[in-house]
Amino acid sequence: MLRNCLRKLGNHQTKCSVKTLHTPIYRTKNLQVLRDTLSGIKLLEKIITSSSYNKTLIYEPKYKSKPQVVSSHDTMRLHNVMRELLDSLQVDEATNTRLQSNRPRKLGRVGLQLFMDCIQDNLTATSTSLTCSLLEHYFKYPEKEVTNGIKAGLRYIRDFLAKNKIIVKSQNDVDALVEQLTMSSSDSQSIKRVLKAINYELFSDDIVRVINGNKTYDEVDVSKGWKYPAGILDSNEAYLRSLELPTKKLVSIDKDMLVLMYDGTLRDANKILPTITYARKLRKSVLLIVNGDCTGDALTSVTINNNRNKRENNESRIVVLKYSKKANNDLAPQENLDFIKFLRLPCGYDSIYSPEYSPLVPSKMCADKYYGSIESIKATTGEAFLYNSIDAEAIPNKVPKSFLQNTVTLSIGGHNEIEIDRRRNAIDNCLNNVLCHGLAKGFIPGYGISLLKAIPGLNELKANEPNFMTKVGINAVLSAVILPSEVAFKNAYGYNYYEINSLIAGAINEKSFPMAKFSPNSEPVNTVKDGNLEPWSKMDSCLAGVETFIELLTSCNTIITCVYKKPERHKA
């Protein structure tokens, strides 16, 4: 598994194979090898802990000459910065032969890459500090039983948090959480507007899109109906221009439209011309959904019709969408009964026109057989929103109901691009990285408080364990779980060593799970009311990733690396 991870290094070619004597092979029985493997993660820990909890990180991007500032609230950009760091280490090693013989650097890069693959998108101060602390304890006692104790401790914490996670439903509690997560009142007000538009039902990260706006204030646009997982046909520039998509970026039709579903690839213009003529006379637009492609004379006729109607001030347009079986739960058009019902096709799946089997070409004469209807559409080349006033409960099958939802687009305003980018990243992180996961699966107290609450149970687990070395592993977990809180209290509040220890002891002794002190001279506060929460699913995935990495590294007895050639320059 380690070798597979190490071979994913772009276009650089391997100079040596495993069979040669020149390939660096390291035995993990030598603890210094494992310590070198951990060195890259320690560097990452310093970066993450110094830029977490209201801190900022200054870095120079790969393609920019000026330093950039990344806030601790912008976890997505922080993750990208770490990926750039890993890429730079790989490139430096491939282009510098001296670095290839530098064992600590090579192993540090290997460990860092493996850690990033295990932890995935849960790169936090918690994941790095736990990993470094637990492995340092393992290096002192490199026994399998110690690893078992570490795994038992981490699994106990995961079970404890799963049983005690907090479900937040009250709008007041959600608003308090938003106030805590945002940096300004304008950000919190925009987020509250979005939540109100979807009735505080933010259970997925694809419900709200946060984009750069072109005004000085924020705008909220709500798209209701069926979220169609494919956009307007984009294979022909002339067709896109006929819909004015390159300039307007969006096709929005708020009047009743005809709907025609076509099974197969539409090439022959004679199959669509009767529909074009019928729609032009009705001055209605047509939503044409093809299970294949639309090309040749048929697409040319559609383009000419759109341009002609635009010149004549006729509102009729032909909007072509491609049907994706994969994006519709692997259902063929004839099998997607919920979608057929939503489009109000008059004869169900018999209304899907097939040039091979249907006796009549769709036209005015057989309109009651083929044409459905929708009330409005908003579409780009990436996705579309179809709206019909239909009761969601009337749709029998449960799986496609995920397409029936309100989707909100929040356009971020500001006085310059820097302000807009900063606010967009922060708000997007708050909505789609924190709130959506927490509202869907539950919250736990933030600032590492939830890990402190598990300490009494870990002590009991340790006391009941008969094996001494397993106890050592559990004790390593007990020592590690206080580190995230130490970082949080120091960075967020600037407390000294004694104040931090006092707060940690108070959180451990407080029996109520959501209660904790955030100031040495104050009473315990409810983290739900105060808004100091974080998503349970994120912490659970973080602990699972740490456990996976530790198990992978401690169960491996050999690390095989590669020597890479410099990339050859191709002559023009």
UniProtKB/Swiss-Prot annotation:
Question: Which sequence ranges are listed under topological domain Mitochondrial matrix?
Answer: 17-471
- Tell me a Gene Ontology molecular-function term this record carries: unfolded protein binding
Question: Which Gene3D superfamilies does the UniProt record give?
Answer: GroEL, GroEL-like equatorial domain, TCP-1-like chaperonin intermediate domain
Q: How does it sit in the membrane?
A: Single-pass membrane protein
GO annotation, cellular component aspect = mitochondrial inner membrane; mitochondrial matrix; mitochondrion
What InterPro entries does the database record attribute to this sequence?
Cpn60/GroEL (IPR001844), GroEL-like_apical_dom_sf (IPR027409), GROEL-like_equatorial_sf (IPR027413), TCP-1-like_intermed_sf (IPR027410)
**Where, in residue ranges, is this chain on the Mitochondrial intermembrane side?**
489-572
Print the keywords alphabetically.
Answer: ATP-binding, Chaperone, Membrane, Mitochondrion, Mitochondrion inner membrane, Nucleotide-binding, Stress response, Transit peptide, Transmembrane, Transmembrane helix
BP GO annotations = chaperone-mediated protein complex assembly; mitochondrial respiratory chain complex II assembly; mitochondrial unfolded protein response; mitochondrion organization; protein folding; protein import into mitochondrial intermembrane space; protein refolding
* Annotated TM spans: 472-488
- Record's subcellular location: Mitochondrion inner membrane
Read off the transit peptide span from the entry.
Answer: 1-16
Q: Give the multimer and partner information.
A: Forms a high molecular mass protein complex of approximately 850 kDa.
Q: What does this protein do?
A: Chaperone. Required for the assembly of succinate dehydrogenase subunits. Ensures mitochondrial gene expression at elevated temperatures and prevents heat-aggregation of the ribosomal subunit VAR1.
The similarity annotation says: Belongs to the chaperonin (HSP60) family.
This chain belongs to the protein called Mitochondrial chaperone TCM62
Gene name, per UniProt, is: TCM62
